[in-house]
Amino acid sequence: MLNMKSFALVMLFATLVGVTIASGPNGQCGPGWGGCRGGLCCSQYGYCGSGPKYCAHNTPLSEIEPTDAGRCSGRGTCSGGRCCSKYGYCGTGPAYCGLGMCQGSCLPDMPNHPAQIQARTEAAQAEAQAEAYNQANEAAQVEAYYQATQAQTQAQPQVEPAVTKAP
């Protein structure tokens, strides 16, 4: 539980790093608390704010609270710089804005949005893993070919050249 001293430290830290905390009882959000107002993100720890610490985590779909006011399906647009998820709800973060998760307004003109950065990072990691797998597979095939060639060479009988004697 967050006591008043801890809450004050969180608010001071948020001010120093340039994020905005929502007004309301302790700025809490998520299941049981509801969403954030004014286009703010709900952090993985359940507090409203802006910036990567609040918007960069992947919100599980079970925690996305559907409300008629937050629906965008059919229109594909959301206010406050939020994305319209493929499930038809407005929000921020990879669950709404990530590659393959967004419809309509997907922040194509905001390449530095935390969700876009995370999506590009995940795509680059997947590509690097695929390349590493392909290189390892190719190396294994070359090694197997080399071993098979060596085995064939050793299995062939050694024939010594015939020596003929002069009469």
UniProtKB/Swiss-Prot annotation:
Disulphide-bonded residues: 29-42, 36-48, 41-55, 72-84, 78-90, 83-97, 102-106
Alphabetical list of PROSITE patterns matching this protein: CHIT_BIND_I_1, CHIT_BIND_I_2
Signal peptide segment: 1-22
Gene Ontology BP term (one): defense response to fungus
Organism domain of life: Eukaryota
GO molecular function term, any single one: chitin binding
Gene3D superfamilies reported in the protein's UniProt record: Endochitinase-like (3.30.60.10)
Name the record gives this protein: Antimicrobial peptide 1
Upper classification of the organism: Eukaryota, Viridiplantae, Streptophyta, Embryophyta, Tracheophyta
